[in-house]
Amino acid sequence: MEGGKGEGKRMKEEAPSKKLPPKIYGGDAGTPTKAAHDEILSSLLRINNFDSISSIKDESLDIDLSACVTISSASLVNGNSLSSTDFWRVLDESAQNNTELNLSSDVCRDDLAATSSSTVPSTLTSDNHSSSEFSVTFLRPEPPNAFTNSPFKKTSSSGTSTPVKLSPEQLHQQHQLQMPQSQLLQRKPKLPAATAVRLKVFKEEPPEEKHPPEQVVTKVEVCESELLPPSFTIFQQAKSAESVADAASMPPPAASETKPLEVDPAPLHKCLDCNGLLLETPDEVAKHEAAAHRLRLTYRCSECQREFELLAGLKKHLKTHRTEGRKDTWKKCPDCGKCLKLGSMWMHRKIHSDNKKYQCDICGQKFVQKINLTHHARIHSSEKPYECPECQKRFQERSHLQRHQKYHAQTRSYRCEKCGKMYKTERCLKVHNLVHLEQRPFACTVCDKSFISNSKLKQHSNIHTGMRPFKCNYCPRDFTNFPNWLKHTRRRHKVDHKTGEHLENIPSYCSKKSTTNKAQKAAAAAAAAAAASSAVNPNELSASSELKAKANLTSTAAPAPAKQARKKKQPQQATLAALGITLPAGTALQQVHPVPLAQQHQQELTTVLVPLAPPAPKQTKAKRERKQLAPKQLQQKPQLLQQGQPQQSSLEPIPAVPQIKKEPVQTQGPFLDLHGLSLTSAEELIMEQALEMEECGLYDAPNANTEMGTSDNAISDSAAALHFQIKNELPDELLPDDDFLPCKPSDRLPCPSLESSPFSSPASMELTAVSCASSVAISTNALPVRSGNYYLPAFTLNAHGKLSSTGNGVQSVTTSLAQTPSVSMVNVPLLVRSNQMLPSVDTLLFTNQTGGSRFFAGKSATAATPHLT
């Protein structure tokens, strides 16, 4: 029981104790039955003039309150109840354990709150009245072993309580001295066979002057603190002063048994989540749930204002703000020098001991704990019991799965302080922080580069060693490191390297060539056409309009799909750039497509240069070199007119075309060694060198001859068949001397090579001076012998389809085999048989002649050596 200290003071309702009730000692003999309870309580009512026996039964708690008696001083106190069962249990424990029984106001309050007083509202009293002390005697039948040496509390003059042991006679005398005179007169004799127990109860008298409101008002306050969650405090006021006066003027207990006591109705609603908060109406319950239960309780750190959902998380976080760590937090292992926490050190020390009871049956490794052996056994069994729900990847350890699941998270909570990059895991951030280190301890022994990790150095060393361990699964390309292989697989083939699925929204390499889309290109083409039409005079406009009308009539008869028109467009700008031709600023190429055959006599295909407005300046980025365009795109020929139709001048006059100057490109010095390059790299190098040499004028384009076929400079089917037939019939030996043709050292002649090896290109064939001591008989028309480059001779096919080597009809070649010649220097491999199945680059570019006229007609063919060594 406790009393309020003032009118403004409010009393918090304590939460019910979660501890289990103490065990009742003494068994059935020491604990009174229900009938004994009723007899004791009825005796108390007759002797001490108590109020009544409460016959309330709280259904919410399922506790029968009929065994509880309301104790009051002068019948003025109402609202505090005490269970007789709990009272006898306390007495049994104190008697058998011989311990101190502390029945002060605080302990009484806790005991009452833990048992049955949680549903009974507390009372508020005024501080104008001082508390009065009175004594109550509880009677119970005397057990077989009477209580002896029961401890009680003796109040000193200073206000402190000192536990003492008093005899029953001393207790009786002290009780008579302290009891008021009015109570001594009303006191009745005790029952015989009973034990007297005196309790000191401090209770505050009810107010006399102030009249509280008639209705019970329930007030709820939220007490907030820094570390603890808000708790609801309940305050209730007494109903009215009239009820207190009625309680004082109640009839004696005998009459109260017949007349039931009017009790306040229990609250209709109770919140089970807020320490038993009592609410009257459903509206209050709804408002309370909307205001309180939807709020998220958080705990905020006072140092960094970080919020936590649990108090334990906040306490753990507060340890990080310590200026100095605890001395015993980390310990150093004396055996291996590893630093561990104090709680983990004792388990770590067992690793260095010989007491390892758990041994693996497969490899014989021993472990200290059984769980370590279980984890080790999964290595041999390849068991992975933990599966990722996102990607179905399995792991052997739970910690590995938890670390993997962070990669699926969309949030990147780890930020680099130097560059601001965000990462999903702390491990990724630590790896990234190595980039910002000034020290790069891993240096390459071949070049002067250094790296932050050994793995980066190993990837770099593959460049020097030539190792390309990462090979593409879809093409013959290989790479020195994994990032380049991954980028090639995803962008070039658009395939996921893990699952093999096709990727849709992955940019390809071609997207880097141009940043403009098709709509922008179409708009630019329309603007160019409009500018060109405005520059033409009115006569030309009328002529062009007539041509357009005729074209519309023919198009209605045989409409052509739009996709075919797109295919006819040729990248002329890229073709000119590949050939090294630069156009003046502000010019563009406009291609006029040929008209149908019925109108070919009126107009022919023309190319017009149209001035354009200067484009907006753009930042040029360094792009890596691409493969050159195909030969068909390099040299486009207009379609030949049908025989019998005379070529007529076009109706539209051709404007003057400005001179296009060819800028010579500096050629590389000595040719690179092609032995160390792959086939793809060698072909690219040969293509570039061949184009550069043609642009510089080192090779003269031969006269066009379409005897072999009517196609363009690309090799035809018959030429390809002839090419492979020659390869099969030529022996693997060195070519005889009469199969070579000399040339002047100042003239570089085209080389229609028939060999398809990477070394067969004219850019890579460079045969130097060949000395000879033999006598050569030359005709009168033959030129003197000069040392220079030598190539394959002309050839013809006989009637049986066999290859026969022939010389020019004007020339006569004789060779003396008396002396053996010698070669001074050859800096390229010999022309031998190759296993490659496709024609070489130079064959595609420069082979367009057949028969004997394909080699230097009008020159004498002479040879100097029968063999090359």
UniProtKB/Swiss-Prot annotation:
Quote the tissue specificity entry: Distribution varies between nurse cells and the oocyte during oogenesis. Weakly expressed in follicle and border cells.
Q: Where is the composition biased (Polar residues)?
A: 146-164
Q: Which GO terms describe its cellular component?
A: nucleus
Is DNA-binding there in the keyword field? yes
Q: Which GO terms fall under biological process for this protein?
A: regulation of transcription by RNA polymerase II
Q: Where is the composition biased (Low complexity)?
A: 630-648
UniProt source species: Drosophila melanogaster
Lineage of the source organism? Eukaryota, Metazoa, Ecdysozoa, Arthropoda, Hexapoda
- Give yes or no: UniProt keyword Metal-binding: yes
From the record, give the cysteines joined by S-S bonds: none
**Keywords of this protein's UniProt record, alphabetized?**
Developmental protein, DNA-binding, Metal-binding, Nucleus, Repeat, Transcription, Transcription regulation, Zinc, Zinc-finger
Q: Which GO terms describe its molecular function?
A: DNA binding; DNA-binding transcription factor activity; RNA polymerase II cis-regulatory region sequence-specific DNA binding; zinc ion binding
Put simply, this protein is called Serendipity locus protein H-1
Q: Where is this region: Disordered?
A: 1-32, 134-165, 554-573, 617-652
